[in-house]
C-alpha cells in the first residue's frame, strides 16, 4: 500500500501545491477584509443574506462562517477532482500496469482516495491558517487564528463524505465515479442555497454541509461532525 500511496502522491503533488498556494492567498483575502465587511454590505438586504448564510451572530462572524462554508465546498470539489484521477489512470491503461505487479485493486483505489483526503486537509489548513493569521493581525487577538482554523477544519467531515461517494460510485464502474460531481452540486444547492430558498429543514439536512458547525461565532459541537 505504501508504494501505491507514493505513486498517487507523485501524480497529485503538483496540482495540490498549486491549490494550496491559491487557498493560502484566498485565506489572506478573506481574513484581511473581514474588518471592512460592514462597509461592503451597507444595505439591510445584503446584511440579511450573510446572516442567513452564517447563522444568527455578528456580521463579521457571519461573513467569515459563510466564506469558510463556501470554501469548504470548493475543497470538496478538489477532493472529487483528485479522487477522479482513478478514472484517468484507468482510462489511460496505466492502472493495468500497476495492477499487473500484484497490487490489489483495493490497495490501488485506497491509495488515491487517501491522497485525495489528505489533500483536502492541506487545503483546509492553508485557508484556516492564512485567514486566521490575517484576522489576528487586524484584531490583535491570537484566538482569532484558532477560531478560523477550527472553522476551516470542521468542513472536512462533509468533504470526506463527498470523496466517499466518489469511491463508492467507482466501485460500480469508473464512469459511475462522475456521480461525485452530481452529489457535490446537489449538496451545494441544499446546504448553501436551501436556507435562502426557505426549503423544508429535512431537505436541507440531506446535505452534509448543512451539519457543519458555523464557526467562528458558535460553540463547537462534535455530534454533527460524526
Language-model regions, residue ranges each:
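Transmembrane helix boundary and interhelical loop/hinge segments in multi-pass membrane proteins
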Residues: 80-99
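A short amphipathic helical element positioned immediately N-terminal to and/or at the very start
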Residues: 2-12, 97
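A structural motif at transmembrane helix-loop-helix junctions in multipass membrane proteins
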Residues: 156-189
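Membrane-interface alpha-helices at helix entry/exit sites of multi-pass transporters
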Residues: 104-117, 223
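Long, hydrophobic alpha-helical segments
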Residues: 62-86
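Terminal transmembrane helical anchor/hairpin motif
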Residues: 1, 13, 17, 21, ...
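Secretory targeting signals
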Residues: 114-167
Amino acid at each position: 500500500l505504501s508504494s501505491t500511496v507514493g505513486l498517487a502522491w507523485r501524480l497529485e503533488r503538483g496540482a495540490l501545491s498549486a491549490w494550496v498556494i491559491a487557498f493560502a492567498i484566498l485565506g489572506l483575502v478573506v481574513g484581511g477584509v473581514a474588518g471592512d465587511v460592514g462597509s461592503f454590505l451597507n444595505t439591510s438586504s445584503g446584511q440579511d443574506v450573510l446572516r442567513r448564510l452564517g447563522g444568527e451572530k455578528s456580521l463579521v462572524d457571519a461573513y467569515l462562517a459563510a466564506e469558510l462554508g463556501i470554501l469548504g465546498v470548493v475543497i470538496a470539489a478538489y477532493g472529487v477532482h483528485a479522487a477522479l484521477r482513478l478514472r484517468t489512470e484507468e482510462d489511460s491503461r496505466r492502472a493495468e500496469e500497476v495492477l499487473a505487479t500484484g497490487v490489489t485493486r483495493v490497495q490501488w483505489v485506497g491509495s488515491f482516495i487517501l491522497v485525495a483526503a489528505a489533500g483536502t486537509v492541506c487545503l483546509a489548513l492553508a485557508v484556516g491558517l492564512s485567514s486566521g493569521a490575517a484576522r489576528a493581525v487586524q484584531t490583535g487577538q491570537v484566538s482569532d487564528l484558532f477560531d478560523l482554523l477550527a472553522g476551516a477544519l470542521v468542513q472536512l467531515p462533509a468533504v470526506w463524505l463527498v470523496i466517499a461517494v466518489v469511491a463508492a460510485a467507482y466501485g460500480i464502474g469508473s464512469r459511475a465515479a462522475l456521480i461525485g460531481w452530481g452529489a457535490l452540486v446537489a449538496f451545494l444547492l441544499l446546504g448553501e442555497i436551501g436556507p435562502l430558498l426557505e426549503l423544508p429543514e429535512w431537505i436541507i439536512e440531506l446535505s452534509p454541509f448543512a451539519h457543519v458547525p458555523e464557526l467562528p461565532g458558535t460553540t463547537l459541537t462534535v455530534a454533527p461532525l460524526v
